[in-house]
A protein has these predicted regions:
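N-terminal targeting sequences that direct proteins away from the cytosol to non-cytosolic compartments
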Residues: 14, 20-73, 114, 137, ...
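Conserved polar/disulfide-associated segments of primarily extracytoplasmic proteins
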Residues: 60-147
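Generic N-terminal leader/processing signal
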Residues: 4, 17-20, 31, 96, ...
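Bacterial N-terminal signal peptides that target proteins for export
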Residues: 1-8
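Charge-rich, low-complexity amphipathic helices
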Residues: 1, 120, 124, 189-197
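Alpha-helix N-cap/helix-start motif
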Residues: 1, 87, 164-168
Length: 198
C-alpha cells in the first residue's frame, strides 16, 4: 500500500511515496526545499530526471502540479516510448504524439519548435503548442521534453507567452538526466545538496 509521507531532514522537506519497506525508486516526483525554490527528481527505472524550480513563490499543488508563479503552472510527466511508436527520435516523436492528441480534441492546433529556449542541447526539446476550440478560445503551453532510455520526461508549462520564456530557459538549463537509481542514498545526497544551497 502506497502512502505519501513527508520526511523532515535537516533543513529540507522531501515528499516521498513509501512502499512498505522496499528500497524501490519512488513512483512520484520528489521535491527538496532550497533557499530559493525546489530541487526535484522524478525516477523511471534506473535513471531519473532532475530539475530546479526557482522562486520562493513556487507552490507545490501535488507531486505532478506546481504553481510556478501567479498565473503560470507546470505539470510533470513521463511518456513511455511504447506510446510514441518511434524508437529513433524520441523527442520529435513525443512532440508529434502531443500534437496528434490535441488535433483529435481541438478545432485548431499550432506548434513551433523553440530552439531559442534550448540553446545547443540535443537531449532536450521545447515545443510551443497553441490549441483553439470552435469559439476561438486559445490555450497554450511549452512542452519541455528530456530524452531518456525508456521514453521522455516532460515538463509542461502554461501559458506559453514571451514573459514566461526566461522561466522556461531556467527550467531547461536545470533539466538533466541522471543515470542512477533514485534510492535512499541518492535521495539523501540530494537533500544534502539542497541543505548546502541554503
Amino acid at each position: 500500500m502506497k502512502r505519501l509521507a513527508q520526511l523532515l531532514l535537516p533543513g529540507a522537506l522531501i515528499l516521498l511515496p513509501i512502499k512498505g519497506v522496499q528500497a524501490e525508486p519512488p513512483e512520484d516526483p520528489i521535491y527538496v526545499k532550497t533557499s530559493d525554490g525546489w530541487n526535484a527528481a522524478y525516477a523511471h527505472g534506473d535513471e531519473y530526471a532532475g530539475f530546479r524550480v526557482i522562486g520562493n513563490g513556487a507552490k507545490l499543488q501535488d507531486a505532478y502540479h506546481i504553481l510556478l508563479q501567479k498565473g503560470v503552472g507546470m505539470m510533470v510527466s513521463f511518456v513511455d516510448k511504447k506510446e510514441l511508436q518511434n524508437d529513433g527520435d524520441l523527442l520529435s516523436a513525443h512532440a508529434q504524439w502531443e500534437i496528434d492528441y490535441w488535433h483529435q480534441r481541438a478545432s485548431k492546433v499550432e506548434s513551433n519548435t523553440r530552439e531559442d529556449l534550448t540553446g545547443t542541447r540535443k537531449d532536450v526539446k521545447v515545443t510551443e503548442i497553441k490549441v483553439y476550440n470552435d469559439k476561438g478560445t486559445r490555450i497554450s503551453s511549452y512542452l519541455i521534453g528530456l530524452a531518456a532510455k525508456d521514453g521522455v520526461f516532460v515538463l509542461s508549462v502554461s501559458p506559453a507567452q514571451k514573459d514566461v520564456d526566461p522561466l522556461v530557459k531556467e527550467l531547461v538549463s536545470s533539466f538533466k538526466l541522471v543515470p542512477r537509481n533514485l534510492d535512499a542514498e541518492e535521495t539523501k545526497r540530494l537533500s544534502s545538496e539542497a541543505k548546502a544551497q541554503r
